[in-house]
Amino acid sequence: YTKRKRGHPKDSIFWGEAGPLRNGKGSPYEAGYRLPCIVRWPGKVPAGRVNNAIFATIDFMPTFANLCGFETPEDRRIDGMDQTELLLGKRETGRDYFYFNNAGVRKGKWKYLKANAHFHGYAVEDGRKKVDELYDLESDLGETTNLAAKHPAIVSELRQLTEDISKWK
């Protein structure tokens, strides 16, 4: 309403603004998943450290369980992994990949989304072309350039990984 009546100042930032990231909550694009995680634990977690490793919210439980001296339950499958060494600065890498439920996978700098990727009902955008998508997140964090046609071997590898994980769950 306000925008129609008076407009918004140039460069207005709205609640939920994703900046240069594509889409938003409910989508497998970076604005739907990428969040900052700020950790402070003097004497344990190195101060001022910035790391872009893959660390998912499902990793908190096994990580904190380990830090507290507890075992993770063995009577059920725990999807998260212990990221204690990453958190404490003893390792620079996180998980090898991250699976986007019924959509695709991120491995290293690459993100693959399958042609029929599922978007939750509240996703900002689902008018996308129904084609395989591949993005280099190191050079294109906004996911603006689909590189699938230029890197068919990577698409094939990540498509297979997506299928394998889908069968496992």
PLM regions and their residue ranges:
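Active-site-proximal N-terminal segment of extracellular/periplasmic enzymes that hydrolyze or transfer
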Residues: 1, 145-153
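C-terminal cap/loop subdomain of S1 sulfatases and analogous C-terminal strand-loop tails that border
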Residues: 2-30, 44-49, 53-133, 137, ...
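Catalytic cores of eukaryotic secretory-pathway lumenal/extracellular enzymes that build
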Residues: 34-35
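Short beta-strand-to-turn element immediately C-terminal to the catalytic PLP-Schiff-base lysine
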Residues: 38-40
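Glycine- and acidic
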Residues: 46, 143-144
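Intrinsically disordered, low-complexity polar regions and short flexible loop motifs
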Residues: 140
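A non-catalytic, amphipathic alpha-helix used as a structural packing/dimerization or gating element
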Residues: 150-153, 157-164
